[in-house]
A protein has these predicted regions:
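Alpha/beta catalytic barrel-like cores
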Residues: 1-175, 181-182, 186, 191
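Alpha/beta enzyme core
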Residues: 100, 104-117, 135-136, 143, ...
């Protein structure tokens, strides 16, 4: 069922969810999980614009009430750098087709294996060709967690928030603005993990690695500052950098050093901002 109006939506949820103004209280989790959350998820995807917006808001608030909440993995990653844990991996799954059902399956597996560190991500390009905007994507992840009783932090990630190289050549500020606009849309939706992909701006023509990586690290630092300025209070969004464009030459340790040294220098010049918690390299 897809709700036809926000009134119908509210009435149908009454046995499980109490809505008073902007306050949402879950009064019967079992009834919510027994079909109502499925209808809410479908309405958040296929309803009219008012119904979609209201359904997504309700899913967010229900998730907040039950503990199925978007979170940043920043502290977990920096903990690894400090030697606080080892011998684990963090799968990052690009869920795009039938997102609600696929995330449900992943969370059932996570519960069976007692796995807590897993990421659901979607790239900028995937958002476009799947017609799956940030608010809808996060709603599907949260709704899936509610359905499966997975009341734990949810790591939702913007994968490859990539600067388009072709546009950057003719309109560099416009190309950066496109990524910033996407970030501005994604952060309020719970995308508190973002991979900044400016690796498309690397040019191999200059003689030094610093010059080759210049646009990559300087624009990455610029976008880092922007994210720190728009992230919610109390949240340090986990940020990733990229030094090798997918499908191009493999990365080298020297390129990594050049990128990180330049990035840290450029970020320090902009102020006192938390930097990257991970970096991706091209390995074939």
């Amino acid at each position: 069922m897809i709700f036809e109006s926000t009134y119908e939506l509210r009435q149908s949820l009454k046995p499980a969810v109490k809505v008073t103004g902007d306050k949402v209280e879950v009064v019967d989790v079992a009834k919510l999980q027994d079909g109502l959350i499925d209808e809410l998820a479908r309405s958040a995807t296929f309803g009219t614009e008012p119904v979609k917006a209201y359904a997504r808001w309700l899913i967010w608030e229900i998730g907040q009430a039950l503990g199925a909440r978007p979170a940043s993995i920043h502290e977990f990653y920096t903990g690894r750098a400090k030697g606080l844990w080892e011998n684990r991996t963090v799968p990052a799954m690009n869920i795009r087709f039938t997102a609600y059902d696929t995330v449900r399956a992943a969370l059932r597996a996570a519960k069976r294996t007692n796995a807590g560190a897993l990421i659901f991500e979607i790239a900028r390009s995937e958002m476009s060709y799947c017609d799956l905007p940030p608010a809808e994507y996060s709603a599907m992840v949260i709704a899936a967690a509610i359905k499966e009783g997975y009341f734990h932090p949810l790591f939702i990630q913007g994968d490859h928030f990539q600067v388009k190289a072709a546009k950057y050549k003719t309109d560099p500020e416009g190309a950066i603005k496109e990524v910033k606009d996407l970030i501005k849309e994604a952060v309020p939706a719970g995308f508190w993990n973002i991979d900044i992909d400016t690796s498309t701006l690397v040019t191999l023509d200059p003689p030094t690695l610093d010059e080759q990586q210049f646009h990559n690290y300087s624009r990455s630092a610029e976008i880092t500052q922007y994210i720190r300025e728009v992230e919610p209070k109390g949240v340090t969004i986990s940020l990733g950098g990229e030094i090798g464009e997918v499908g191009e030459k493999n990365s080298t340790p020297e390129e990594l050093d050049a990128y990180m040294q330049g990035y840290e220098r450029a970020l320090k010049e902009r102020g006192d901002f938390a930097g990257l918690s991970k970096i991706s390299v091209q390995t074939g």
